[in-house]
Amino acid sequence: IALLSCAHGGGKPAFNFNAAVPEGWKTIDSEDPMLFMTKDGGYKQFVLIRERSLAEPFQFTQRSMRKGMLPEEAADIIVNEILSDTNVRNFSLLEKTSARIAGHSGFRLTFIYTDADGFNFKTLYYGFINGDSFYNIRYAATQEDYFQQDLKTFEKVFESFTLGTAKAS
């Protein structure tokens, strides 16, 4: 497992967190402030860690989060955003509960859905607000066997997640 420290600057929003990239997994570059990693490709399994500004509205609902928002309220915004996404079909929320993420109060969602290409995903979605940012850590995999096969690997990534102190460059 390699520890990846992410700090980003320039014209894009800065983000700052650390997470372990499992051995045998690769990261995929993105213009967005996020870390995307997969072992067998995004249509098999992936882990996505993202930081977004609280001021940035979500794409489909145009709703934003705010400082002091309860984790349950933030979770509801995420569920409504997913339900509004035209690329998501057959969405079913299996669980919505409180969670601790790197020492922060947040939430965990477990859900299944079909994407626009017909792939069925099962997802664990963790989220929390810290300062002016919303952080989410998502694990998704197609088919139950892929989900179970890499669940322990995701748990190691999740446990390795910390907010960093690196300066944007």
Annotate each predicted stretch with a short phrase.
Residues P22-W25, F134-S169:
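Surface-exposed amphipathic alpha-helical segments
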